[in-house]
């Protein structure tokens, strides 16, 4: 929260016309938090595979409690995917963030707001990520697999953004916030 506050103040001081977030989910989340109060458009350049760059959702952990906010001002206006920027992401973190994207897609299949189009996107995301992640763990420099993982994450984030969070995320946020996971 303090980082977001400082970021908003700095953006105001320099008269920024957008918030650029390059990195994983926490960095993308910081960009969202800055945009929430400042209404700056977000340019997101993800370097992991969870897909949060495609959602208007922000998770905040404060005093051991994880909460989420949903606001259209936090949906990045532009997302740039560049698989080259993921090449230094260790294979283990690649697999972890990709599994998070798969969890987003599975969740979209049973969410209350699920629909046939989102289900097709979720199934494609799961298929692509299930193929790409083992390739990345075997060869972390496999650019084609990393590009496929970004495609799968894009789909997964789109699913989560469309249907919102279901049981899986609610449990993870409760346990994660409570036990600092």
Which residues make up each language-model segment?
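N-terminal small/polar loop signature for handling phosphorylated ligands or for N-terminal nucleophile
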Residues: 1-41, 135-146
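A glycine/threonine-rich phosphate-anchoring loop and its flanking beta-alpha core
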Residues: 36-120, 124-125
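Gly/Ser/Thr-rich beta-alpha loop segments that engage phosphate groups in nucleotides
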Residues: 25-27, 31, 48, 53, ...
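Short, contiguous clusters of charged residues that form electrostatic/catalytic patches at enzyme active sites
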Residues: 2-9, 100, 104, 127, ...
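Active-site segments that bind and position negatively charged phosphate/pyrophosphate groups
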Residues: 108, 112-181
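General beta-strand structural signal in soluble alpha/beta enzymes
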Residues: 20, 44-45, 81, 151, ...
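Short glycine-rich loop/turn motifs that provide flexible caps or phosphate-binding loops at active sites
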Residues: 20-24, 50, 58, 97, ...
């Amino acid at each position: 929260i303090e980082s977001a506050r400082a970021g908003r103040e700095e953006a105001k001081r320099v008269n920024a016309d957008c918030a650029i977030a390059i990195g994983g989910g926490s960095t993308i989340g910081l960009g969202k938090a800055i945009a929430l109060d400042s209404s700056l458009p977000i340019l997101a350049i993800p370097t992991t595979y969870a897909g949060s760059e495609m959602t208007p959702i922000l998770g905040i952990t404060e005093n051991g409690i994880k909460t989420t906010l949903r606001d259209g001002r936090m949906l990045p206006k532009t997302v740039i995917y560049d698989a080259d920027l993921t090449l230094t992401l260790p294979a283990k973190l690649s697999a972890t963030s990709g599994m998070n994207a798969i969890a987003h897609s599975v969740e979209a299949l049973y969410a209350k707001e699920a629909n046939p189009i989102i289900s097709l996107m979720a199934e494609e995301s799961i298929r692509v990520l299930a193929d790409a992640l083992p390739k990345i763990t075997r060869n972390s420099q496999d650019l084609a697999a990393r590009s496929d993982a970004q495609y799968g994450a894009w789909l997964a984030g789109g699913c989560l953004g469309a249907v919102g969070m279901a049981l899986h995320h609610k449990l993870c946020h409760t346990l994660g916030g409570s036990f600092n996971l």
